[in-house]
């Protein structure tokens, strides 16, 4: 591809993640975006475990049974001349590490907030990561079809709790059963609730008001809306695209994903204002420009058994620069070895299509036989490239894990190996007995692991809790196996590095007093 063509294609890309607290409506709005992208004909909401109607973005069996997202899905479609890459992230807090890594692979984020509840705990955590990245954040205040909090309070909360300016792109005219429509400040029109086609839009005059002949003008809710708009214009934040690009101001859209109200207006604005792919920093201290003709990319996720019939493994790769072509040779930085990328795919949750070409900003799936690890960099060219490391959480909960049927050791070990490589749980082995110990941030990760071992590898496992522990790594040169006890269990991680799992802070303090010269670290 010629440089001009590459630059033109890269400029079409819009790659973003959707973040929210569980049950704020993240999966539902994802469905509606896919509907506008022409990918699906009917949007279905994730319902209870007894329901047979599941979301397109929730593909794993346990997600369908429990109505929660525990993996990051990737969905791609074309819209208004742009190539949209959506990464739908886990809403459950136990899977926040997967979400954090996903946020390293996007150029913008969409924050979905339940307008009845406002900003919740998980939203705060995820916002902090997005803020650190300095990427634009677009906010969708959801569930306007239900009674919720005052819109002015929701806007103020963005600044008070998250420290980011909010600019209301539209404004609700009523809510819940009294919802009449949205006052569109950008397009100077009113979008009526539950109307189809062009009939749902009413133009505003130069004073920002409806023609007096419109029935809505006689409603007190409309009058209240005009008062709110006047207050926003006089005392609210001014729209500032520069601040938005720096992650200092967030455009706020009100709507209802469930009733598909306000979603199209949001999508149109997002496509207009969201950034195209930008440069990415390297461990070497430089940065790689997306229009650099030589391919560079990094692995931000590994997923086993997206197609259980084939027991496959997919490495999710974000292209940072250049053009990807199926069959090309690249260098894997971690090993220094050249590898050929023969098998590649693009996604719609669990469905895939073979992809022959892709450019910077795109997400590509590479069939993996065990070559890749999360955080790996692949590149072309003579100069080695290693992108900045992805975040890794230190586990806090631990269990011993054994197969219930010792005759099924082969499937047990294969399942352990493949699921651990996805990064949701960490694997350790005890020093003397080689017992398997799993570490996780939350209990749900263990439940998902156990479920997948049984249903994907036909290996029933027994998990014996050893409780909440603090992991501390030790320099191998200072290690003496006699230091180990039940209170500070000596294990090794998948890289063979030794660490202690301390029962509590008293055990850690006792160890420090007994071995004052031994240096322990939170991460290796």
From Swiss-Prot:
Q: Which InterPro entries match?
A: EF-G-like_DII (IPR053905), EFG_III/V (IPR035647), G_TR_CS (IPR031157), P-loop_NTPase (IPR027417), PrfC (IPR004548), RF3_C (IPR032090), RF3_dom_3_sf (IPR038467), RF3_GTP-bd (IPR041732)
- Tell me the GO BP annotations in alphabetical order: regulation of translational termination
Alphabetical list of Pfam families matching this protein: EF-G_D2, GTP_EFTU, RF3_C
Q: Where does GTP bind?
A: 20-27, 88-92, 142-145
Compartments where located: Cytoplasm
Q: Where is the tr-type G domain?
A: 11-278
Q: Name one GO cellular component term.
A: cytosol
Tell me a Gene Ontology molecular-function term this record carries.
translation release factor activity, codon nonspecific
SUPFAM superfamilies to which the protein is assigned, alphabetical: EF-G C-terminal domain-like, P-loop containing nucleoside triphosphate hydrolases, Translation proteins
Q: What are the protein's UniProt keywords?
A: Cytoplasm, GTP-binding, Nucleotide-binding, Protein biosynthesis
Q: Which residues form a coiled coil?
A: none
Q: What does this protein do?
A: Increases the formation of ribosomal termination complexes and stimulates activities of RF-1 and RF-2. It binds guanine nucleotides and has strong preference for UGA stop codons. It may interact directly with the ribosome. The stimulation of RF-1 and RF-2 is significantly reduced by GTP and GDP, but not by GMP.
Q: Which PANTHER family match?
A: PEPTIDE CHAIN RELEASE FACTOR RF3
**Similarity-based family:** Belongs to the TRAFAC class translation factor GTPase superfamily. Classic translation factor GTPase family. PrfC subfamily.
What is the official name of this protein in its record? Peptide chain release factor 3
| Species this chain originates from | Lacticaseibacillus paracasei (strain ATCC 334 / BCRC 17002 / CCUG 31169 / CIP 107868 / KCTC 3260 / NRRL B-441) (Lactobacillus paracasei)
User: Highest lineage ranks of the organism?
Assistant: Bacteria, Bacillati, Bacillota, Bacilli, Lactobacillales
């Amino acid at each position: 591809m010629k440089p001009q063509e590459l630059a033109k294609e890269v400029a079409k890309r819009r790659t973003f993640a959707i973040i929210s607290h569980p049950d704020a409506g993240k999966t539902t709005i994802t469905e509606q975006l896919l509907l506008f992208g022409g990918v699906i004909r009917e949007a279905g909401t994730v319902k209870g475990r007894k329901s047979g109607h599941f979301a397109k973005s929730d593909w794993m069996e346990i997600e369908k049974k429990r109505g929660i997202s525990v993996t990051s899905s990737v969905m791609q479609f074309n819209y208004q001349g742009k190539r949209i890459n959506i990464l739908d992230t886990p809403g459950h807090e136990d899977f926040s590490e997967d979400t954090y890594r996903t946020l390293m692979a996007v150029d913008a984020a969409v924050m979905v907030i339940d307008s009845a509840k406002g900003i919740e705990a998980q939203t705060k955590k995820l916002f902090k990561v997005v803020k650190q990245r300095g990427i634009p954040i677009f906010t969708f205040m959801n569930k306007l079809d239900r009674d919720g909090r005052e819109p002015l309070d929701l806007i103020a909360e963005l600044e008070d709790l998250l420290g980011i300016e909010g600019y209301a792109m539209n404004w609700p005219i009523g809510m819940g059963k009294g919802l009449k429509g949205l006052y569109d400040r950008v397009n100077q029109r009113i979008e009526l609730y539950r109307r189809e086609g062009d009939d749902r839009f009413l133009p505003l005059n130069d004073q920002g008001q409806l023609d007096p002949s419109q029935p809505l003008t006689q409603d007190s809710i409309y009058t209240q809306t005009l008062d709110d708009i006047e207050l926003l214009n006089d005392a609210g934040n001014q729209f500032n695209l520069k601040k938005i690009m720096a992650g200092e101001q967030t455009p706020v859209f009100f709507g209802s994903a469930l009733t598909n109200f306000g979603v199209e207006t949001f999508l149109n604005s997002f496509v207009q204002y969201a950034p195209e792919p930008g440069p990415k920093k390297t461990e070497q201290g430089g940065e790689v420009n997306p229009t650099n003709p030589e391919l560079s990319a990094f692995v931000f996720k590994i997923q086993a058994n997206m197609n259980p019939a084939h027991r496959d493994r997919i490495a999710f790769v974000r292209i940072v620069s250049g053009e990807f072509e199926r069959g090309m040779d690249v260098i894997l930085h971690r090993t220094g070895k050249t590898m050929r990328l023969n098998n590649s795919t693009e996604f719609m949750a669990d469905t895939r299509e073979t992809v022959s070409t892709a450019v910077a900003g795109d997400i590509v799936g590479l069939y993996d036989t065990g070559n890749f690890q999360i955080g790996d960099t692949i590149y072309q060219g003579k100069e080695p490239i290693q992108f900045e490391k992805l975040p890794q959480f230190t586990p806090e909960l631990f269990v011993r894990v054994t197969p219930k049927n010792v005759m099924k050791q082969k499937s047990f070990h294969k399942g352990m190996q493949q699921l651990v490589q996805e990064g949701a749980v960490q694997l350790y082995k005890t020093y003397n007995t080689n017992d398997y110990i799993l570490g996780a941030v939350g209990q749900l990760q263990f439940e998902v692991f156990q479920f997948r071992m049984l249903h994907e590898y036909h290996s029933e496992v027994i998990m014996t809790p050893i409780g909440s522990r603090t992991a501390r790594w030790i320099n191998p040169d200072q290690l003496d196996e006699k230091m180990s006890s039940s209170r500070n269990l000596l294990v090794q991680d998948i890289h063979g590095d030794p660490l202690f799992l301390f029962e509590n802070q008293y055990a850690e303090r006792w160890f420090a007093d007994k071995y004052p010269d031994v240096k322990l670290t939170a991460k290796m």
